[in-house]
Amino acid sequence: MTLTVLNVAYPLAPVGPDAVGGAEQVLSMLDQALVQAGHRSIVIGCQGSSAAGVLIETPAEPGVLDEAAKRRAQRAHCAAIATARARWPIDVVHLHGIDFDAYLPGDGPTLVTLHLPLDWYPADALNPAREDLWLHAVSAAQQRTAPPGARLIGPIPNAVDVDALSEPKAKHDFALVLSRVCPEKGIHLALDAAKKASVPLVIGGKVYPYETHTTYFRDEVEPRLDDRRRFLGPLGFVAKRRLLNTARCLVIPSLAAETSSLVAMEALACGTPVVAFPSGALPDVVEHGKTGYLVGDVDEMAEAIAAAPSLDPETCRAEARRRFSLDRMVSSYMDAYRALARLGTDSGQLATAR
């Protein structure tokens, strides 16, 4: 069964292999997998995106990302979805944005991946009335947080391309943070912990032009930077892979409930242990004392950063290969696409018969 799948990214973040966010990276992996399998992949993303299949770009918002900018971007996405559905026989629409309900098609087989904490979504958006609208979590830990009344199918766990990431290199004496730069990611705490541990820290990530994000960077991150604690800005895949393979550890000081932590999986694929607060799904990703350390505060984080080189890189790689299989994730999505496409075909045949 050859499929035509329309993947729709969050309107305010570019999608592609070099994307910063986990949702955008997962979408990019699915786009590539669809094309490699001989299906038609269509991607809607804002200007600056890239795709293996057909890309429909919507305008990028040039200024502060306020509510007016969000509404403009959502309207552009609505128009792009309508254009795609008019041009191609779409089997499944796959939405990835937290604001998916703002541009949700009124009919047709639709899959929604809930990449972010479930309590960040409007409660009524998690209770679809349509039988051809399926919502799912990206981890069992996230699924367990579903509010009463939420209608979700089983989770489809995130994964990473271990073969593409793993590039064994000598470890260097620095800790690494890879993250969006915003208050809930707690990057200032990683800076404090690295300073306590007397270990250099490298930060790669993007400050999106939301007012709260730029204020956080200015007030909490920038004052803590010096010649041993550096902010590199956004990183492409090649630079990210090099840093992940050579760091003594990845630090995840997230204050939000991580739904799966793609970057933790990437670090383990590179043989790099993870030091993290036990937020959300992180205890399901990091095995304390084996592939990293789960810590309770900045002091424990500093101790774990110092101890990280004692953990075996090959154990980290082996666990990533065993537990975070990209093939398994892609297969699960393909199964969901086919099931939804059959549902759409059956509905169409029923409507024709009537």
What is each model feature region?
Residues M1-R354:
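Catalytic cores of nucleotide-sugar-dependent glycosyltransferases that transfer UDP/GDP/TDP-activated
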